Structure formats: C-alpha cells, structure tokens
Amino acid sequence: MGHETMTPATTTLVFTYGTLKRGFSNHVLMQDLIRSGDASFKGVYQTLDKYPLVCGPYRVPFLLNKPGSGYHVNGELYAVSPRGLSRLDELEGISRGHYIRQPIRLAAAEEEEEEEGDLETEAPSSCVVEAYYAHKSYEEELWRRNRGRSFGAYTENEARGYVKRNDRPQHLSFLDHIRIFVSSPCD
C-alpha cells in the first residue's frame, strides 16, 4: 500500500529531545518512519524559552512544561505524517498518561552536518511545533525529585545508565516506575 506524499498541510512538526534523537535507543522508530515516508528530518533546533529537561527512572528523559526554568533545550525537528504521529503518540504513552503532547516554540540551532533524511523543504528559522512533555500527574514530583536541577541536552552522559523498556521489570507499569522513582531518596 502506497503512502501519500507528506505536505505541510498533512504533517505535524515534532521536536525530539531524548531517546528519539539520532544516536539514542528509540531513534530506530524515527528511522522506520523516514524509510516509510512518514517522517523527514528538518534540522537541529533549540527551545526559544528555557525548560527543565530531567531524567526519571532508568534515565528516561522528561521535558517539564515549566517555561522560564532550566535551559534552552537542544533537540531535533521532524515533519511527521498522521500515521507517524500516531506511532510516536503510542511510544510516548499519550493515551496511558505517560506524556502529553503540547506546543513549544523553537529556533534553529547552528547548522549541523546532515546524517539522514533530506530537507525536502526549507526548515523555518523559528516555529511553534509539538513536543512531548512529562504528564501533569507527576511533573511536579519529578521536578522536586531532581531538586530543581536540569540540563540543556540529553547526551551520552545523561543517558548513561538508560535501561530500555524491554529490560525494565515487566510486572510494573511505566507510571509505577515513576511513582517509585519520585518517592525514593535523591542521590
């Protein structure tokens, strides 16, 4: 079955800041979406406003919707088809209260050598796009658990100790892992 060509009217721009970025464990999904024509890489971007980017259980990254706190967060921008967006929403647990998808303002970061995909259309220098934030049900506790400390980019250093979903205890839900993490003593 063929895919319709993605057009600006049929795509959603999505900002990725964690494990969906190139070089991280969930980027395989972005690669699949690019191969199937359901996503295209648009460039390296940074949030216009400062936001806290923190790690939760198993070094999973979370963007907290607290504009003005934290740093300008670095990440990657993708144009995603409706089918691709559905797959991202599933990964991020939108219907299960894991993350919420909301708008965020971005600015293009300095040019970086492109590794995959092509820039089919010129990417905007600044724009409002969608991002996956920590769900409101645990956002404040996650911020307190991190003692108000955050970082501006999810790098190999922040990802050290990351545990893939299939390697985590399977008898607990994602939200159970978060509840345990936020109630545990800080390092």
From Swiss-Prot:
Its EC number is 2.3.2.-. InterPro entries: AIG2-like_dom (IPR009288), GGACT (IPR039126), GGCT-like (IPR013024), GGCT-like_sf (IPR036568). One of its GO terms (molecular function) is acyltransferase activity. Substrate binds at Y17, G18, T19, L20. The keyword Transmembrane does not apply. Transmembrane segments: none annotated. Pfam families: GGACT. The active site is at E92 (proton acceptor). Keywords: Acyltransferase, Transferase. Putative gamma-glutamylcyclotransferase. Belongs to the gamma-glutamylcyclotransferase family. This is Putative gamma-glutamylcyclotransferase At3g02910. It comes from Arabidopsis thaliana (Mouse-ear cress).
